Amino acid sequence: MKKILSLSLVATAMLLNASETANLEKISVVEIANSVEVTDVSEEQIKSADLADALSKNVPSISIVRRSGIANDIILRGQKKDNINILIDDAKIYGGCPNRMDPATSHVLSNNVQNVKVIEGPYDVENFGTLSGLVKVETKEPTKDVHGEVNLNAGSFGYKKASATTSGGTDKFKLLISASTEESDQYKDGNGDTFYEQQVKKGMKAVPNTMNPMMPATNATYINPNQKAYEKKTVLTKGQYNITDDSEIKASYTANRSDNVLYPTGTMDADYDDSNIYTLGYTVRNLGKLSKELDLDYYYSNVDHPMSTKLRNSGATSYMTAQYKTSMNGQKIKDSFEVANSLVTVGLDTSVRNWKGESFTTNVATGAVTGRTVSLASTDTTNKAAFSKVEKSFGKLDLEVGARYDYTDVDSSDTKKMDRNYDGLNANIFGVYNVDEKMKYFAGVGKSSRVPDARELYSTGMGAQGNSNLEDTKNYEADIGFDKTIGTFKIKPKLFYSELKDYIYNTGTTFQNIDAKIYGLDISGLYALDDHFSFDYGMAYQRGKKDGNYTDKDLAEIPPLKANLALNYEIEKSKYTAEVVAVDRWNEYDSSAKEQELAGYALFNLKYTNQLHKNIGLTLGVDNVFDKVYNSTNTYQDITYASIGSQRVLFNDPGRYGYVNLKYSF
């Protein structure tokens, strides 16, 4: 696999020198063959605002990391955090919390999302840090014609939501405005227990002080047993101005405001999460032989995330706050043009991320703040990169070859910390052989990398301490599969093997580089039984192993076998869906990283939609119909959980959840 770079260069030369006539429109070989697209998210995934929940239901290779009633995280083929890249309208946003309370997926709500495209593997050269996968979130686009909709949603556990969207414009200018507000009480598990009741049952009235065992145990339960689980408000605005038929300017702003988000598995909750995403883009087409399409893009994002113990009994008289802030800005210029019957894309990509954090104590009676300490010194991660991509068709064979060179500086404001710089050349080759319209084979090999983040290098706060000697992680991966249609039956199996060098792993006290491998397969498809009935199916299985002499050789956060099955019945203006999400027993886990065995489970969900009137739509649904008690998420030590003795507290997922959504559109 280490010959990927030279193979990529040879393949590029072959493509540019080939004389066979090709289709010079954008082939998007990787996106066509090696991606999963979840469409109409705002229309279909209306249960709640949680994008992670929607993705885990629709993409077999994605599993949810549930720690709250909202703002949950995802694992893609055994990878999460910085090992996968998440873009929102081509902008990068990172969470502020080192404990993953506010992952990137939490900074956009499903009611604002049009489509999500998931590209598995290292087949992305346009964006910084795509190690093992790319999740591209596309929000709603403005329209010329005047459109709008209002949604009212209610569900179990006191869930209430209202959202509204309007869009319209002219041939020259289009504008979209969307806003939403929602709140929920604590969900109940299959036993009927709320967050607070689970805390009491699991012994969180007396959590030992792991930092100082000589100190008395703390009461980490909620002061108010009926504390709301969260409140959330969002705004999305988008505008497009068409300068000419071949050029336009686009701008957008996304705001997320979340308050008092409860994380019952830990000892702190989020006081608030405030985030903003700004984007500005200019596109011009047909400038001449050297520019089929030229794109100039800029984005800026920022997050303010304070978490504290003030909602817990441990913080009744004085509470601790850990406040983290992060921001990122990026610029990209990309040009596509034709050379030797090939479509060539070249570009420059730069970005700067800042991350910093501090902790302090507040006296409830007086409001006095004391003990301010820096937990993460202000750190800039500056990336500069050049990339290129060539796409070409040779009859039935479509090829895409890409390469990217990165130079990254990581600079800490703490003069006692060692600044780091990293450079890397990454490349991939991906091909699709189209036997006919109903059968295609695809395969790819690639090398990618990602640098350590500020927490992994320099953190002095809670949990594992930073290690400034970390190297960047390299991924050498191969993927192969086929896509076959037989009448109304479609099947798409894929195999992958990923060799990870200098993989960044949390040892409990610090971070270290290890070598490891992840491999697996997934199968997806559908079967249209007739004009009314259809069956969607998908399954994913992956395993992760450490290389070397370790007490436990299993990698952490490698979910077990998972299957998604759905039977749909459509007639006139109605659609009925019965869905099963089944997960095998989690019996291969890293006990040395504080994971534990989890029982398997199968959930049965029902959903009904009806277009009652041309302007009015109704959706009814029940998730976890049989009120199962289950756990979707393991207790890897990269996240701080409350511990009772040697056992980390394991929280149950939601029990039976019913919901109704009424939509008025015009």
Feature-to-residue mapping (PLM):
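Short acidic/polar hinge/loop motifs at secondary-structure boundaries
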Residues: 64, 92-120
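A beta-strand signature from Gram-negative outer-membrane beta-barrel systems
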Residues: 107-149, 665
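Transmembrane beta-barrel wall of Gram-negative outer-membrane proteins
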Residues: 156-183, 194-259, 274-286
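C-terminal beta-signal and adjacent terminal beta-strands/loops
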Residues: 190-191, 501, 587, 610-666
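Flexible loop and strand-edge segments within Gram-negative outer membrane beta-barrel domains
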Residues: 228-232, 246-294, 301-326, 379, ...
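Surface-exposed extracellular loop regions of Gram-negative outer-membrane beta-barrel proteins
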Residues: 257-259, 302-306, 361, 366-367, ...
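Outer-membrane beta-barrel signature, preferentially recognizing the C-terminal barrel domain
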Residues: 268-290, 323-328, 375-381, 417-420, ...
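Gram-negative outer-membrane beta-barrel transporters
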Residues: 392-399, 408, 490, 495-499, ...
